[in-house]
C-alpha cells in the first residue's frame, strides 16, 4: 500500500491540485465554508477551545480558520536566556548535526544543506558543523510559525520545486524530499550566529507567508529569487523570541539550521516523533548571551 501511495505522489499534478485547493480555501462560501470547517474539526479532533475564535461560523474562509490565532497566553514562551523555544506546534521528524553539508532525512536518506538553501553557497557554509531540526505540522496543528530566539532578518530566498506531500511516509521514501519541494528560506542574524528557518511547501499547501512580505507562494515559478534586508537602522526587521514570523495555509514542515556551537543540548524529551508545543523549551544554548 505504501508503494501505491508513493507512486501516486509522482503521478499527481501536484501544482495544479495545490492551486485549485488554494482557490477553494480562500473562497468565502458562507454555509458551505462553515460546513467544511466543522467537518475538518471533527475529522482531525481539533481543540477549538484554544482558538481565539472558537466558533466555526466566525471564519469567513477555510484559510482564515486554518491560520487561526490562539487565545493570548495559551502558549506561554519560555523566557530563560539560555533556552531556545519550539517555533511551532507539531512533531519532531529528525534532528542532529550537520556533517559535511549533509542533513539526515530518514533511514537511508540524506540531503544537502546547499540544495536546501537554494544553492546559496555562502549561506550553506555558515551552517557547516552546526545542527538542524525538522518539525512536521499535521493538519490538526496550529499553523503559525514563531521565532525560536530573537533574530534580525538578513536574507530571504524563494526556491521553486516539487510539491510532494510532507509526512513520515514520504520522508521515508522520497529522496531529498525537503530539498526538492518548493520552499522559502529566511536567514536571521542572532547573538548565537545565523539561524535559517526553511518553510517547506507540500501538496495542497495553498501558500507560504511571512510577516514582513506577506504571501511568497503562490505564484510558483522555476527561478530562485533572493531578497536582502538591512540588519541595522530603522528598516531592520527584528523579531523577538516567540514572535510570529510566518504561517502555512494548510500544513507542511519547518527545517531549522543552527550555527556551529549555538546549541549545547536539545531539551529533555526533544527527539524524533516527540510532540512539540510552540514556546516550550527546545534546546539549551552554549552561548549564555540573552536570546529573548
UniProtKB/Swiss-Prot annotation:
EC number, UniProt record: 4.1.1.65
InterPro entries found in the cross-reference section: PS_Dcarbxylase, PSD-B, PSD_type1_pro
Entry membrane topology: Peripheral membrane protein
Alphabetized UniProt keyword annotations: Cell membrane, Decarboxylase, Lipid biosynthesis, Lipid metabolism, Lyase, Membrane, Phospholipid biosynthesis, Phospholipid metabolism, Pyruvate, Zymogen
Locations listed in the record: Cell membrane
Predominant location: membrane
A biological-process GO annotation: phosphatidylethanolamine biosynthetic process
Key word Lipid biosynthesis present: yes
Active-site residues, as the UniProt record annotates them: 89 (charge relay system), 146 (charge relay system), 252 (charge relay system), 252 (schiff-base intermediate with substrate)
CC terms in the record's Gene Ontology section: plasma membrane
Known pathway: Phospholipid metabolism; phosphatidylethanolamine biosynthesis; phosphatidylethanolamine from CDP-diacylglycerol: step 2/2
Listed PANTHER family: PHOSPHATIDYLSERINE DECARBOXYLASE, PHOSPHATIDYLSERINE DECARBOXYLASE PROENZYME, MITOCHONDRIAL
Family as reported in the entry's similarity comment: Belongs to the phosphatidylserine decarboxylase family. PSD-B subfamily. Prokaryotic type I sub-subfamily.
Role, per record: Catalyzes the formation of phosphatidylethanolamine (PtdEtn) from phosphatidylserine (PtdSer).
Subunit structure of this chain's protein: Heterodimer of a large membrane-associated beta subunit and a small pyruvoyl-containing alpha subunit.
Protein name: Phosphatidylserine decarboxylase proenzyme
Organism: Shewanella sp. (strain MR-7)
Amino acid at each position: 500500500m505504501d508503494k501505491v501511495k508513493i507512486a501516486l505522489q509522482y503521478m499527481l499534478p501536484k501544482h495544479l491540485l495545490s492551486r485549485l485547493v488554494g482557490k477553494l480555501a480562500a473562497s468565502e462560501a458562507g454555509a458551505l465554508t462553515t460546513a467544511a470547517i466543522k467537518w475538518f474539526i471533527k475529522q482531525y479532533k481539533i481543540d477549538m477551545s484554544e482558538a481565539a475564535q472558537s466558533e466555526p461560523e466566525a471564519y469567513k474562509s477555510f484559510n482564515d480558520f486554518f491560520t487561526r490565532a490562539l487565545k493570548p497566553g495559551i502558549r506561554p514562551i519560555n523566557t530563560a536566556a539560555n533556552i531556545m523555544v519550539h517555533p511551532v506546534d507539531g512533531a519532531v521528524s529528525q534532528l542532529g548535526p550537520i556533517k559535511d553539508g549533509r542533513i539526515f532525512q530518514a533511514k537511508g536518506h540524506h540531503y544537502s544543506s546547499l540544495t536546501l538553501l537554494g544553492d546559496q553557497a555562502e549561506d550553506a557554509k555558515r551552517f557547516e558543523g552546526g545542527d538542524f531540526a525538522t518539525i512536521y505540522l499535521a493538519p490538526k496543528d496550529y499553523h503559525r510559525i514563531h521565532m525560536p530566539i530573537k533574530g534580525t532578518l538578513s536574507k530571504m530566498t524563494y526556491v521553486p520545486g516539487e510539491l510532494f506531500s510532507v509526512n513520515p511516509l514520504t520522508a521515508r521514501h522520497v529522496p531529498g524530499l525537503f530539498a526538492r519541494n518548493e520552499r522559502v528560506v529566511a536567514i536571521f542574524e542572532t547573538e548565537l550566529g545565523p539561524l535559517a528557518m526553511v518553510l517547506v511547501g507540500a501538496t495542497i499547501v495553498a501558500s507560504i507567508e511571512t510577516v514582513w512580505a506577506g504571501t511568497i507562494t503562490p505564484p510558483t515559478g522555476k527561478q530562485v529569487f533572493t531578497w536582502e534586508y538591512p540588519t541595522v537602522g530603522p528598516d531592520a526587521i527584528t523579531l523577538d523570541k516567540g514572535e510570529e514570523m510566518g504561517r502555512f495555509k494548510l500544513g507542511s514542515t519547518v527545517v531549522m539550521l543552527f550555527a556551529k556551537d549555538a546549541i549545547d543540548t536539545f531539551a529533555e524529551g526533544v527527539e524524533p516523533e516527540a510532540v512539540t508545543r510552540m514556546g516550550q523549551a527546545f534546546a539549551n544554548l552554549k552561548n549564555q548571551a540573552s536570546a529573548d
